[in-house]
């Protein structure tokens, strides 16, 4: 079990707080300053002394290590045609868990999430995944846009999910190594992430709704990509 993030009391200072923050940042653990009421909620009645560590029941992997395990070379990527999912700043743990459940069901080879501005992989996320989250490798990246460029160099084609894209999921070429990028619930894909994608793809909606829940969109896109892999 690893530490997903460290929460510090808002306006907290002093050598001890500074040391905690320094250790967390050295280990790549996000640090967040929050009101004391939030700390009390997260501590669930326990004495927190201005610091709460949010633990992750699943240890995140390094991106390069995960990719090497999936397909170590460009030729291996072209032969295996892996399916990757990249999640850009989804903030609701329940959506995160539901997305992971769909990813496992579709046979996704790996998931990549940002190190910051991402929902924690907590008990709520695990519950929403129906316990499937430990069955798929998940890695964290400090820079999604740069990481997508590296994916393309490895031989992956990167599709970004965007509601206004002219290309629909029915028109996408899924019979190749693919990484699908999903945006956040409210803002969608970050501009630099959009720029890093090879192509944007949309889900055509027939009824009078503007968009789908991000976990529903994930399921549709992943199973479209899984079809030629069946």
Residue ranges of each PLM-predicted region?
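Structured adenosyl-cofactor binding patch, chiefly the S-adenosyl-L-methionine
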Residues: 105, 110, 120, 124-132, ...
């Amino acid at each position: 079990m690893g530490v997903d993030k460290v929460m510090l009391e808002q306006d907290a200072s002093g050598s001890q707080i500074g040391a905690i923050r320094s250790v967390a940042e050295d280990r790549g653990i996000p640090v967040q300053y929050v009101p004391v009421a939030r700390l009390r909620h997260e501590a669930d009645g326990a004495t927190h002394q201005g610091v709460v560590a949010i633990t992750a029941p699943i240890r995140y992997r390094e991106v390069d290590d995960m990719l090497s395990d999936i397909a170590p070379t460009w030729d291996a990527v072209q032969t295996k045609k892996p399916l990757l999912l990249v999640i850009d700043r989804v903030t609701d743990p329940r959506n995160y868990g539901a997305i992971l459940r769909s990813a496992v069901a579709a046979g996704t080879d790996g998931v990549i999430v940002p190190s910051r501005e991402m929902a924690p992989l907590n008990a709520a996320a695990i519950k929403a995944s129906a316990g499937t989250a430990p069955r798929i490798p998940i890695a964290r990246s400090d820079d999604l846009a740069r990481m997508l460029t590296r994916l393309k160099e490895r031989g992956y084609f990167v599709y970004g999910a965007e509601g206004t894209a002219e290309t629909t999921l029915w028109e996408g070429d899924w019979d190749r190594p693919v990484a699908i990028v999903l945006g956040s619930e409210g803002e969608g894909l970050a501009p630099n992430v959009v720029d890093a994608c090879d192509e944007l793809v949309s889900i055509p909606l027939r009824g009078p709704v503007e968009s789908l829940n991000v976990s529903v969109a994930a399921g549709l896109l992943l199973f479209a990509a899984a079809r030629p892999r069946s």
